[in-house]
From Swiss-Prot:
Superkingdom to which the source organism belongs: Eukaryota
Protein's name in the database: Ubiquitin-conjugating enzyme E2 S
GO cellular component, one term: anaphase-promoting complex
GO biological process: anaphase-promoting complex-dependent catabolic process; cell division; exit from mitosis; free ubiquitin chain polymerization; positive regulation of ubiquitin protein ligase activity; protein K11-linked ubiquitination; protein K27-linked ubiquitination; protein K29-linked ubiquitination
EC number(s) from the headed UniProt entry: 2.3.2.23
Length: 223
C-alpha cells in the first residue's frame, strides 16, 4: 500500500507525529505503538487481550492506516493476528462506530486504540462482520468463548511468556509482516469468566429456576 504522507498537509503531519511520539513514549495500558519510520500513516500496534475475556493472555497485532483525508476521514483498522470476534472480518478489518459514523476530526489515535481494546471486552453482535461469531455470541456463549480462546492460544500465544512477548514486539519493531490467515478451527467445550459470560450465565440461571418451578407445580398436581 502506498504511503499517504505526501498527500497530508504539513500541519497534519506534525500533529500525527506529535501524537504518535506521545503514544510511543506513554501508551495506554496493554497497548504498544510501533511507528513506521518510512511511513507515518501506517501504524503497527499490539494489544494485550483483556483479563476476564476469551482473549486474555493473547497478544494481538493490528495496524491503523491513515488515509489522505485524515483527520476529516477516520483511519482504517485491521487485526493482523487471526482472531475470532464478531466485529473483525475475514481480512482482519475492524468494524466499530468510532471508525465510521461516530468519527470526528477531534478524536485522536489514542481514542481509536482504546475503543478497539474495549471491543475485545464488549463485542457488538449487531454489527457483525463475522456472522458466525456474532450468532454464537448471542445463542451459545460457551461455544463462542471456546472458539475465541482456541484461536487466541494458537495465533496470539506470544503473550504467554515474557520471551514470547519480547519476540513478538521485536518482530513488529523490525517491520515483520502479518501472521498467516489459517482457517477457523472448530471449538471445544468450555466456559469463560467475564462480563458477557456472566450475562449469559444469569439468563441460563433464570431459565433453570423457571423450569424447576414448573416441574414442582406439575408434581404437586399429581399428589
Amino acid at each position: 500500500m502506498n504511503s499517504n504522507v505526501e498527500n497530508l498537509p504539513p500541519h497534519i503531519i506534525r500533529l500525527v507525529y506529535k501524537e504518535v511520539t506521545t503514544l510511543t513514549a506513554d501508551p495506554p495500558d496493554g497497548i504498544k505503538v510501533f511507528p513506521n519510520e518510512e511511513d507515518l500513516t501506517d501504524l503497527q500496534v499490539t494489544i494485550e487481550g483483556p483479563e476476564g475475556t476469551p482473549y486474555a493472555g493473547g497478544l494481538f497485532r493490528m495496524k491503523l492506516l491513515l488515509g489522505k483525508d485524515f483527520p476529516a476521514s477516520p483511519p482504517k483498522g485491521y487485526f493482523l493476528t487471526k482472531i475470532f470476534h464478531p466485529n473483525v472480518g475475514p481480512n482482519g478489518e475492524i468494524c466499530v462506530n468510532v471508525l465510521k459514523r461516530d468519527w470526528t476530526a477531534e478524536l485522536g489515535i489514542r481514542h481509536v486504540l482504546l475503543t478497539i481494546k474495549c471491543l475485545l471486552i464488549h463485542p457488538n453482535p449487531e454489527s457483525a462482520l463475522n456472522e458466525e461469531a456474532g450468532r454464537l455470541l448471542l445463542e451459545n456463549y460457551e461455544e463462542y468463548a471456546a472458539r475465541a480462546r482456541l484461536l487466541t492460544e494458537i495465533h496470539g500465544g506470544a503473550c504467554s511468556t515474557s520471551s514470547g512477548r519480547a519476540e513478538a514486539t521485536q518482530d513488529l519493531a523490525s517491520g515483520a509482516s502479518a501472521s498467516s490467515a489459517d482457517p477457523m478451527i472448530p471449538g471445544v467445550l468450555g466456559g469463560a469468566e467475564g462480563p458477557m459470560a456472566k450475562k449469559h450465565a444469569g439468563e441460563r440461571d433464570k431459565k433453570l429456576a423457571a423450569k424447576k418451578k414448573l416441574d414442582k407445580k406439575r408434581a404437586l398436581r399429581r399428589l
